[in-house]
Amino acid sequence: MKSKISEYTEKEFLEFVEDIYTNNKKKFPTEESHIQAVLEFKKLTEHPSGSDLLYYPNENREDSPAGVVKEVKEWRASKGLPGFKAG
């Protein structure tokens, strides 16, 4: 797994978020592996809302993996943090 969000393309990160959202059993066969993915999401995004982005969406955004990625991308840009790698 990649250690920084800047190592992901936006598409790769969206796929990661989709796998968490759907609890993809091929990617996360156990509850523990799913929990670890959620914790990795929190670490990668550095967003103050953490996993709440996944489970308690802001009323002003789409409740979907794409909405999560958009919010993370916009928040990181507003804080001057690195974004996704080109690709």
Curated annotation (Swiss-Prot):
Matching CDD domains, A to Z?
A: Col_Im_like
* SUPFAM superfamilies on file: Colicin E immunity proteins (SSF47345)
Segments passing through the bilayer: none
Q: Which family does it belong to?
A: Belongs to the colicins ColE2/ColE8/ColE9 and pyocins S1/S2 family.
Which keywords does the record carry?
A: Bacteriocin immunity
Checking InterPro entries in the record gives: Colicin_E_sf, Colicin_pyocin
Organism of provenance: Pseudomonas aeruginosa
Give the protein name, as stated in the record.
Pyocin-S1 immunity protein
The record's Gene Ontology biological-process terms are:
bacteriocin immunity
Membrane keyword on record: no
What start-end ranges are recorded for coiled-coil regions in this protein? none
Q: Does the keyword Transcription regulation apply?
A: no
GO MF term (any one): toxic substance binding
A Pfam family of this chain: Colicin_Pyocin
